[in-house]
């Protein structure tokens, strides 16, 4: 009975992440912030503020992190909601599990700022962060040795995954090569009129619906734009998918988004890329953000941490001198 009640409480909480035709935009944003914001960050994570590319960002630094590993987290919220405050607790847990700093940009939201405003903001953040991390790596490199490339992770959930893919599709190879992992939670991958989700009648999803998709897409951009890869990543051509960074997709078994994720993972693999689809039995959309109710939330983030850090662990045994320096951080130095 207690487990069943916890599940109901988790579903009630997670539904506040979705925006549908019956929602009021101001109420949607307010309820999300009231529910998910926190005064104290978990695991002694320290927060500082910084502008990357003139975009306000949070930088979350755990007690121990790899000095050349940094994550850009592109939050969900149906393109119309979400903020640094909403995602601080969740991203603090990610920072701890992945031994890295996490940057949360406060990008512009629809409908006041439709596509491509959010994409442009994230591109500006990425360019500025990439440049600063390169400079930092050069300054910390011993004379006569080659500077290490920064290890950048792109992570996102829901509608944020749409924006993340738009960023990746438009990056030059020199930038893509510095992205060690792409981590997508319950990604939105096809907002086009032909999307199976748009036309779904009976669904088992306890959080998401076709109505959420339609309303979010309508506020985000024009109907014609939903047919392009920057808005519907699943529609990318093979050329855009080539040399895509190693990708980890995590989601629940009961999600309406699962079929699109399976198709996307298959296409990435067909184009010679690494992709793991991690599906959690009985779980729902963004179950990772209901950790006070679902034990699976903690286990899922543990797995993300192992995926992100496994390559570095492999390097330790082969080339000790290339092991990322671990440092204690009292505050972010970005």
Regions found by a protein language model. Give the residues of each.
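A glycine/proline-hinged amphipathic helix-loop "lid/cap" segment
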Residues: 1-63, 313-334
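Short beta-strand-to-loop junctions in surface cap/lid or active-site-entrance loops
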Residues: 56-67, 236-241
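Short beta-strand element of the alpha/beta-hydrolase
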Residues: 68-77
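Short amphipathic alpha-helix adjacent to the substrate-entry channel of hydrolases
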Residues: 85-104
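Hydrolase active-site cap/lid region
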Residues: 169-227
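Serine-hydrolase catalytic core
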Residues: 225-281, 299
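C-terminal catalytic histidine-bearing segment of alpha/beta-hydrolase fold enzymes
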Residues: 263-265, 269-330, 334
